[in-house]
């Protein structure tokens, strides 16, 4: 069972909500220190695939099955992880080969994990089983592997994983295409042409009668070569991330254990606006055949180019008498030369943060602009807030601008009333973007009723 990363925070918020419901936090009533200090918590989790397909035939290579342990709270150190694996449910279906950190005994094994991490960049599965179909197993045979785990650490000295982690194993017959060999590239330059070969291996027990390969590149990459078997297309316009796609149908049969490569190795050309790019390859068997294990039908590799993108915040100057409503058109601009796309994280590329000038009230905010308190916290009302944060999409092209028109009511005339307009990453504070060569223009002003120059 893989637990959502945000559950710990949700649990703490739930405890606070319960306190509210009980009347512990009421207007004018001081909250005891014990109520403010929620008890620390930590929990152990098992990460394992819910399903695993195996090709029919005991003589075929086994399938790796990656299993890992992690815990919630990085305030605690968790060690001496002990993962129990029960394969009694695989009798007559599959055989398991154990790694060196597992000690088998009959149909169970105890696998050790010296240090249990929190889920993040440093995490990787610590136990890799090798599973293949049992001799004599029939197509459609099914079994189950179950897991349990404990470790040392946490607030109580011991943490234990929920007892509902398992992997369902199914024996199937058919092709199983697997993409490999696609390697990431760092330090490339705009204008470079890179060779990025990949292979497709049939790990199944039946041959694939041809295959379809879909090659997708992000906006900063182009495919300089064409293949007769491919139809090229682009995705542009609206909120869709701009991409290039080649859909290719090859009639070459791929035997069990055999491999397929393109007629010529894949090449990609970096455009002048390239920055953080990606190449994706997905495949499926031809003639409508079903792939036994689709999880390895896809591969992706990053291409990092050395480039810059000058982000700019644009403020405004407006005038109005008391009682009038005026429009202040704020804007974000990417002066290039690079495009920026947070395709991996899905985060906004930037946010335009406005501190409302004195003497005016926001009566209408643009879509996507969240009201904030002056310190950057949650504000309940969409209008009348002292601060707003307007998020950009997850990508922005060079030499493009996005406007954010605010309707402001002038409550009283304050000469030279000024509010800050600054770019953030969506948080409460300004940031320095690593690709931006001119951070000084990330800040501007909204001025209401500026004093005329003498």
Task: Give the positions of each predicted feature.
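Secretory targeting and sorting signals
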Residues: 1-37
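Low-complexity, acidic Ser/Thr/Pro-rich repeat tracts that form intrinsically disordered stalk/linker regions
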Residues: 2-6, 32-61, 95-107
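Extracellular/luminal low-complexity Ser/Thr/Pro-rich, glycosylation-prone repeat/linker regions
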Residues: 36-45, 73, 147-179, 281-313, ...
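A surface/secretory-pathway sequence property marking extracellular, secreted
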Residues: 39, 78-117, 211-250, 347-389
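A short beta-turn/strand-edge loop motif at beta-sheet boundaries
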Residues: 45-46, 73-79, 93, 204-209, ...
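Surface-exposed, proline-enriched loop/turn segments that connect beta strands in immunoglobulin-like
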Residues: 47-53, 98, 180-185, 228-231, ...
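Short beta-strand elements of extracellular/lumenal beta-sandwich folds
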Residues: 50-79, 184-207, 316-349
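Low-complexity, intrinsically disordered segments enriched in Ser/Thr together with acidic residues
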Residues: 115-141, 249-276, 389-420
